[in-house]
């Protein structure tokens, strides 16, 4: 048995191929059942996200193993092997162990250190548990991986700094204002970036959130989720003075918030400061706003500088995280090799016990039939000795015949012949 990881990800395949190899949540149970029907597969976990599709398997190692698994993957997704082969990567044994630990810790992610992948790995593991498709080795590996990912999070700073535009915008707001709990926030737009910003702000318990969008319908679902008020874009002028922080990200070709609008808001607020974060391209807020007193305007380029600085910090933390993964993967492989020894010892003891049981039964039967007890005992001892030393004797003879002195010495050591 060996552990194997294979897959494709954002580094090896374009989205046009990744989307054809993905497993939908509804199909995971069928995929696992089909996978475990393959003769060489003893257990499996299927991890499928927008950036990667990976199989983690415990398998019987054979020469045509890769070909069999490629054939299964291609048949399942109705692809030709030529479409997939060049994008597939393979990791065996310790490499498979360290790869999974790196993935779960965010070290192999498109955004270094992102935390979402750990939840996705846990979900994939839970699916395999539910479908009873885990081998003992895989179950132990994933449990170990979760503890390693937690250790990486707690012992390094890999997740401490913002490396997404949405997170950076919220980080900037928290740097300028000590607490967000007494502040009102206006979000302009209702796209993916604003969704992420809104969720971050909800976690920091802002006083009140307003979402302004071209249509109310698009913004209403997000507003319901985060407890926000919804207004339309034309209403911004009347409500701008209510906001301490304005974060904007729309696809508008022209600015939505102009200098005059901000001047009126500042006058209404009696010049209480306002933070503007414009993460739209083209810009949603006129650059001249940044020249007004008590109006602090940051563009997407300003956020990129924050992100680049934070990414450098994450890169430094990643070095420490890689060291943790290397250490823990070696620890796991030590345990795995020990399990192989346990199984061998169990088989050896079972074989010896079977010989003892068979020969004892014959000896007792002979005594019951009136045979001389001393003779039966001597014969039992003689036959038992011959049976137990037969296989080791053949191995010793073969090693000597082959001139394999290293193996011969190994056999002597295992039989305790050089012990005093």
From Swiss-Prot:
Associated pathway: Porphyrin-containing compound metabolism; protoporphyrin-IX biosynthesis; 5-aminolevulinate from L-glutamyl-tRNA(Glu): step 1/2
Site entry: Important for activity: 99
GO BP annotations, alphabetical order: protoporphyrinogen IX biosynthetic process from glutamate
Pfam families: GlutR_dimer, GlutR_N, Shikimate_DH
SUPFAM superfamilies per record: Glutamyl tRNA-reductase catalytic, N-terminal domain (SSF69742), Glutamyl tRNA-reductase dimerization domain (SSF69075), NAD(P)-binding Rossmann-fold domains (SSF51735)
Broad enzyme group: oxidoreductase
Reactions accelerated catalytically: (S)-4-amino-5-oxopentanoate + tRNA(Glu) + NADP(+) = L-glutamyl-tRNA(Glu) + NADPH + H(+)
Residues the entry annotates as binding NADP(+): 189-194
Entries under InterPro entries matching the protein: 4pyrrol_synth_GluRdtase, 4pyrrol_synth_GluRdtase_dimer, 4pyrrol_synth_GluRdtase_N, GluRdtase_CS, GluRdtase_dimer_dom_sf, GluRdtase_N_sf, NAD(P)-bd_dom_sf, Shikm_DH/Glu-tRNA_Rdtase
Catalytic residues, chain numbering: 50
Documented EC number(s): 1.2.1.70
Gene3D superfamilies: Glutamyl-tRNA reductase, N-terminal domain, NAD(P)-binding Rossmann-like Domain
Keyword terms of this UniProt record: NADP, Oxidoreductase, Porphyrin biosynthesis
Molecular functions per Gene Ontology: glutamyl-tRNA reductase activity; NADP binding
Residues binding substrate, per UniProt: 49-52, 109, 114-116, 120
Family named by the database record: Belongs to the glutamyl-tRNA reductase family.
Role, per record: Catalyzes the NADPH-dependent reduction of glutamyl-tRNA(Glu) to glutamate 1-semialdehyde (GSA).
Free-text note on domains in this protein's UniProt record: Possesses an unusual extended V-shaped dimeric structure with each monomer consisting of three distinct domains arranged along a curved 'spinal' alpha-helix. The N-terminal catalytic domain specifically recognizes the glutamate moiety of the substrate. The second domain is the NADPH-binding domain, and the third C-terminal domain is responsible for dimerization.
Misc. comment: During catalysis, the active site Cys acts as a nucleophile attacking the alpha-carbonyl group of tRNA-bound glutamate with the formation of a thioester intermediate between enzyme and glutamate, and the concomitant release of tRNA(Glu). The thioester intermediate is finally reduced by direct hydride transfer from NADPH, to form the product GSA.
Subunit structure: Homodimer.
Protein name listed in UniProt: Glutamyl-tRNA reductase
Gene name for this UniProt entry: hemA
């Amino acid at each position: 048995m060996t552990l194997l990881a294979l897959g494709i990800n954002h580094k090896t395949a374009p989205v046009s191929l990744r989307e054809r190899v993905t497993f939908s949540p509804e199909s995971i149970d069928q995929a696992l059942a089909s996978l475990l029907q393959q003769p060489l597969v003893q257990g499996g976990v299927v991890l499928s996200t927008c950036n990667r599709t990976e199989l983690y398997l415990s398998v019987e190692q054979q020469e045509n193993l890769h070909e069999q698994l490629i054939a299964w993957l291609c048949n399942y997704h109705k692809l030709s092997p030529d479409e997939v082969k060049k994008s597939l990567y393979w990791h065996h044994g310790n490499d498979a162990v360290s790869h999974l630990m790196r993935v779960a810790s965010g070290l192999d992610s498109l955004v270094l250190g992102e935390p979402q992948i750990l939840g996705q790995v846990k979900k994939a593991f839970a699916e395999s548990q539910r479908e009873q498709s885990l081998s003992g080795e895989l179950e132990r590996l994933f449990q170990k991986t979760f503890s390693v990912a937690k250790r990486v999070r707690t012992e390094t700073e890999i997740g401490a700094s913002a490396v997404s535009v949405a997170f950076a915008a919220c980080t900037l707001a928290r740097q300028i204002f000590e607490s967000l709990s007494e502040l009102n926030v206006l979000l302009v737009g209702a796209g993916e970036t604003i969704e992420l910003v809104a969720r971050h702000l909800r976690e920091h318990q802002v006083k009140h959130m307003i979402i302004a969008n071209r249509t109310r319908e698009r913004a209403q679902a997000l507003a319901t989720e985060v407890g926000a008020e919804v207004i339309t874009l034309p209403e911004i002028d009347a409500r701008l003075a209510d906001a301490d922080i304005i974060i904007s990200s729309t696809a508008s070709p022209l600015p939505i918030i102009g200098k005059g609008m901000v001047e009126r808001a500042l006058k209404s607020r009696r010049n209480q400061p306002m933070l503007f974060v414009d993460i739209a391209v083209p810009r949603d807020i006129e650059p001249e706003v940044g020249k007004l007193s008590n109006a602090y305007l940051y563009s997407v380029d300003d956020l990129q500088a924050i992100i680049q600085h934070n990414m450098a910090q994450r890169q430094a933390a990643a070095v420490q995280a890689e060291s943790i993964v290397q250490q823990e993967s070696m620890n796991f492989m030590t345990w795995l090799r020990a399990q192989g020894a346990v199984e061998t010892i169990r088989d050896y003891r079972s074989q010896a016990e079977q010989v003892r049981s068979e020969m004892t039964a014959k000896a007792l039967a002979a005594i019951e039939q009136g045979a001389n007890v001393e003779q039966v005992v001597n014969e039992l001892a003689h036959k038992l000795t011959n049976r137990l030393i037969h296989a080791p004797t053949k191995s010793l003879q073969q090693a000597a015949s082959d001139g394999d002195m290293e193996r011969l010495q190994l056999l002597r050591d295992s039989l305790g012949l050089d012990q005093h």
